[in-house]
């Protein structure tokens, strides 16, 4: 069960939609919503005023929705710790972290302090729900698609998403591969989910002319999916953290929220 959801708050235009999505998710699961605002006062012109603006926005929307909440405000200006590490520390006391799809324009204007979703996913120890930077998503988790490929990544993501799967009206386990589900794997997967009170379908999509990422995005549109679940492996590539070609592509082209798990 989801009991406490953490939403990262900042000054970016996408914060409003991210907060609305978090409130809807908290109401759906009867969870507490923790708002986390991380900032660096030496880099800001009016840190106290900006912090007050973010807090007022958060409390007004949450109180209006009738959701229980907590507020956390952290100044890392004089700490020897990065933003992702600080967010990860506080996320370890919650069930899920909600952030927005990162946009270069937000970073350039210093709206948002998040520069690496990979670092958040790797360091939080919790599933990370990424909300598209544009659009509204009031009903997250009614129709869920899990990108499945037998192995630790997909298994961890499925388990992390279990409270969402149990509350969903429709769950589809999708594999875009030639061999998956060929030896009764689909039946075992369905049976396992059934034992957890999840009624799911399994679907094997043979690889075609489209990439795996585009195939998954097409399925999202065709099946009216409102949440995609994806397991990713974070590795170091040329000195930078990298979540792989498929994860990177989906993060850039996402049309619905994605729950990512490492």
Predicted regions mapped to residue ranges:
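Short secondary-structure boundary segments
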Residues: 37, 101-102, 231-233, 262
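Charged helix-capping and loop-helix junction motifs
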Residues: 112-116, 187, 217, 242-247
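Structural beta-alpha unit
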Residues: 62-97, 104, 197-228, 233-241, ...
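A short, aliphatic-rich alpha-helical micro-motif
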Residues: 91-92, 121, 165, 222, ...
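N-terminal positively charged helical leader segments and presequences
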Residues: 32, 39-77
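Short beta-strand elements of ligand-binding domains
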Residues: 98-102, 124-134, 258-262
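Small/aliphatic-rich secondary-structure junction motif
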Residues: 1-48, 123, 140-207, 225
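Active-site glycine-rich loop that binds ribose-phosphate moieties when present
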Residues: 110-135, 152-163
């Amino acid at each position: 069960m989801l009991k406490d959801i953490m939403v990262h708050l900042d000054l970016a235009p996408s914060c409003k939609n991210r907060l609305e999505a978090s409130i809807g998710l908290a109401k759906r699961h009867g969870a507490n919503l923790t708002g986390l605002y991380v900032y660096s006062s030496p880099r800001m012109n009016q840190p106290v005023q900006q912090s007050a603006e973010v807090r007022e926005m958060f409390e007004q929307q949450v109180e209006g929705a009738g959701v229980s909440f907590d507020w956390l405000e952290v100044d890392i200006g004089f700490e020897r710790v990065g933003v992702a590490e600080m967010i990860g520390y506080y996320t370890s006391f919650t069930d899920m972290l909600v952030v927005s799809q990162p946009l270069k324009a937000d970073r350039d204007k210093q709206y948002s302090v998040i520069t690496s979703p990979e670092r958040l996913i790797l360091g939080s120890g919790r599933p990370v729900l990424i909300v598209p930077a544009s659009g509204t998503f009031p009903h997250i988790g009614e129709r869920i698609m899990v990108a499945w490929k037998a192995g630790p990544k997909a298994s961890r993501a499925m388990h992390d998403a279990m409270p969402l799967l149990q509350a969903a009206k429709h769950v589809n386990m999708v594999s875009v591969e030639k061999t998956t589900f060929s030896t009764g794997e689909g039946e075992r997967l369905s049976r396992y989910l059934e034992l957890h009170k999840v009624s799911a379908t399994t679907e094997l999509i043979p690889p075609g002319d489209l990439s795996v990422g585009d195939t998954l995005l097409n399925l999202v549109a065709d099946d009216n999916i409102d949440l995609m679940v994806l397991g990713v492996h974070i590795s170091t590539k040329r000195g930078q953290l990298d979540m792989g070609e498929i994860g990177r592509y989906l993060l850039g082209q996402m049309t619905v929220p994605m729950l990512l798990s490492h």
